[in-house]
Amino acid sequence: MEANGYRITHSADGPATILAIGTANPTNVVDQNAYPDFYFRVTNSEYLQELKAKFRRICEKAAIRKRHLYLTEEILRENPSLLAPMAPSFDARQAIVVEAVPKLAKEAAEKAIKEWGRPKSDITHLVFCSASGIDMPGSDLQLLKLLGLPPSVNRVMLYNVGCHAGGTALRVAKDLAENNRGARVLAVCSEVTVLSYRGPHPAHIESLFVQALFGDGAAALVVGSDPVDGVERPIFEIASASQVMLPESAEAVGGHLREIGLTFHLKSQLPSIIASNIEQSLTTACSPLGLSDWNQLFWAVHPGGRAILDQVEARLGLEKDRLAATRHVLSEYGNMQSATVLFILDEMRNRSAAEGHATTGEGLDWGVLLGFGPGLSIETVVLHSCRLN
């Protein structure tokens, strides 16, 4: 057999499809209104009253009601180096994340596999994505062991991609599913804020936004082409997936891993940069499918912050309810980096069923998942919803 014939024989017939979704969060929940008092107390920073007032304003404007955080007061007291703004603390942080990240991923993955309904031994590929710590072997292998997956599972580990990585994981899973007949890909995003948690300092205002916005969570999907009738229940079809880097925008958002942990920089122009470029990205992705009416699409938009959602909504002329699922996830969980857009897909399919819609996409046929992250990179995933029984 020639190479081309082999490729055709071993490729799937249909598009990649999301077959199951599972999510998980740490049990520790923080109330956003009460968090400024807790944060300044636990970091021994009550004397910084002006900074505390600024932090409170940031929390109030974030459109977040609560978040889940792995770091409890007990853990923080046991690791005082995490509390100081610029103290050498990488070893302490790393010791926490190498256990926390795969553990949280396991919870989400088990839920997804249970919903999927097939034996976990049928998983052929694993895509693991996290910006929370680096180790070799990585969290992908740890998760494989925790789940008891076959050692023959083909693994892809995506470290430190950034907040757009939920879209990246979907793009990679799509390619694996469509180019390997019968493949079932477990795609997992697991994020904890352990590396970026630190006390306040007047010289590091950007860190206040990180402490106010970010939360911890993991999401897992099972992705595969050609669903088995009567066994697998498709949720969304992945029609296309693409990435673009915006020119001359590298300094808009980024993170740097240092001895003090992970530090983020977020330029105030970030929302406007995204909004001014978003329509071009959407047109490039959607025009081949004949999609141009943005209000006839369902939306899963990475909530990097309230201002980003507001400006994207305004630029595209979206009706207020179009970003309802996105804003709900931001309110209940904060920005969970790569996992957030996958939480939004889960929220969307659940509320679509609860509200009696005909499809998993709020009654609409087509939709878009958008991820924004360092680069500045935009992931655009075009989805087709599936019928609800």
From Swiss-Prot:
Tissue-level expression: Expressed in both the leaf and rhizome, with higher expression in the rhizome.
UniProt key word Acyltransferase: yes
Catalytic residues of the enzyme: 163
Thermal dependence summary for this entry: Optimum temperature is 25-35 degrees Celsius.
Variation of activity with pH: Optimum pH is 6.5-7.5.
Record's keyword annotation contains Acyltransferase: yes
Any single biological process term in GO: polyketide biosynthetic process
Xref: PANTHER family: CHALCONE SYNTHASE (PTHR11877:SF105), HYDROXYMETHYLGLUTARYL-COA SYNTHASE (PTHR11877)
Name of the protein in question: Phenylpropanoylacetyl-CoA synthase
The species this protein was found in: Curcuma longa
Name of the gene this protein is made from: DCS
